[in-house]
Swiss-Prot record:
GO biological process, one term: tRNA processing
Location(s), subcellular: Plastid, Chloroplast
Family: Belongs to the intron maturase 2 family. MatK subfamily.
Pfam families linked to this entry: Intron_maturas2 (PF01348), MatK_N (PF01824)
Summary of the function given for this chain in its UniProt record: Usually encoded in the trnK tRNA gene intron. Probably assists in splicing its own and other chloroplast group II introns.
Source organism per UniProt: Silene otites (Spanish catchfly)
Name of the protein in its database record: Maturase K
Disulfide bonds: none
Taxon lineage: Eukaryota, Viridiplantae, Streptophyta, Embryophyta, Tracheophyta
Keywords: Chloroplast, mRNA processing, Plastid, RNA-binding, tRNA processing
HAMAP family reported in the protein's UniProt record: MatK
A GO MF label: RNA binding
Amino acid sequence: MEEFQGYIEREGSWQHNFLYPLIFQEYLFRFAYGHGLNQSILLETSGNRKYSLLIVKRLITRMDQQNHLIPSANDSNQNDFWGHKHNFYSQMISEGFSGIVEIPFYRLLIASLEKQKKVKSHNFRSIHSIFPFLEDKFLPLNSVLDILLPYPAHLEILVQILRDWVRDASSLHLLRFFLYEDHNNNCNSLFTPKNSISFFFFRNQRFFVFLYNFHVCEYESIFFFLCNQSSHLRSTSYRALLERTFFYGKLDYLVNLFTKDFAVILWLFKDPSPHSVRYKGKFILASKGTFFLMHKWKFYLIHFWQCHFSVWSHPRRIYLNRLSTHCLDFIGFLSSVQLTSSVVRSQMLENAFLIDNTIKRFDPKIPISTLFGSLAKAQFCNRLGHPISKSVWIDLSDSDIIDRFGRICRNLSHYYSGSSRKKSLYRLKYILQISCARTLARKHKSAARAFLKRLGSEFLEEFFTEHEKVLSLILPKNGSNSRGFYRGSIWYLDIICIHNLANDE
C-alpha cells in the first residue's frame, strides 16, 4: 500500500478529492486485484476467467472516448457500452473503482495513526480483545441494549453519505451506475432485512462490503459524538484529581448551557458512562442508568436513524435487557454478568463471624445447542449430538483425515479458550474425536470401538493443542478436572474472525 500511496501523491487530482480521473490509470487495477508491479499480469478468479492488463487498457480507451459512464438510474438497463461481455467488463471496472474509492479513507487512517503515534499491531484486529473490554467495563453496569443495525432502504442514501468524502460529481455518477447495475441484476434493495449478510454474495464483494462498512461508520461517528459530549468532563477529569472538584456541578452547568439548542438530548448528559461495542451488524450499548433511561436510548436511536439517515428500524430489532438476568449472544458466546456469593469465616479474639460477599463476574459461555446444530449441518453428528462419520472424507488418507479433525478441534479450543465453563468445550472435542474414529473405521470397514482400541491414547493427543499441554504444566488446575488441563479463561489475541462453526447464522 505504500507503493500505492506513492502513485497517488503524484496525481494532482487527489488535491481536491477528485477520484474520477484515477480510474483511467492502469496501475490502479493492479492494486485493486492485489498484485504488485512485478507480479503476473493475470489474476485467477473463482471461475475460469482471467483478468489481463490488455483488457483493462482496451476498457480505459473506450471509457476515454465515450461518455457512457454517466447514465441515469432509469436507463442503466439500456446502456450497451459493455457489449456482449457486460457482466465481465462491469465487474472489472467496479473492482478497480472499489480500490479507488477507498483511497480517501486509507489516507485518513494513516494520518490518524501518525497523529496519535500508534504502532500498527495485528492484535488491534483481534476480536477477542472485545471480551477483556467487556470484563472490565460491563461489571458495574445494569442494563444493556442488544441492537441489530438497520440497513439502507434505498441506494441513493449510500450515494448521499459519500458526498462529504468524494467531491467530484463524476465519481458519484459512476458509483450510482454500479449500484443500480448490480441491483437490477440481483434484487430490489441492497441490504434486505430477511438476510443480514446478503450483500456478501454480490459479484463484487469488496465494493459492497466497503459501502456497508462506511454506512455503519456514519452511524457510529454521529452516535459517538453524542456519547462523547455526555462523558467529556468525566474523561478529562482523570488527568488531575483536582478537576473532580464540583464535578457534578459542572455537569449541571453543561446541561443548562445546552438547554436551548439541544433540549431533545438533555437526558444524555444525565448518564455519563455508557459503553458500547460493535461487531459486523450487531451493536451493544450498556449503561449504569435506570431501565427507563435505556428505554430513552432505544427510542432515540430509532428516531435518529429515521430522521438523519431516512432508515426505518423496527423497535423489535432493539432488545432491552438487564445484564444480571440476560445472556448476550455476541460473537459466538453467550455472555452475562453473574452474581457469585462467597462466604468468609473470620475470627477476632473470642468472637467468630461469617462475611457473605456478593461478587459480580463476567461469564462467557459456549452456546452448546447452537454448535450442535452447526456440527450436525457439517455432518459431524446428528441433531441430538451423537457423533457420526464424515462420509465425504473417506477417500482421503488416514493422516489427512486425522489432520482435518484435529485442526477443527484445535481452532475451536483457541476460539473458546475464554469460556468460563470448559465442560461444553470437552463435549465438542469428544464429538469430533468419535466422528474421526468412525470415519476411519468406515474407511477401513471395521467397528469404531475396535478401531479406537487399536489406535490407543496417542490418537486422542492429536486433538489437544500445544498450548493446552504447556498450560497444564505451568498453571494451577481448578476443581476435579479429569483431563488435567487448565480451566480458566484465556483470550487468544491473534483471532481476527469468528470460527465458521460458531458463525452459523
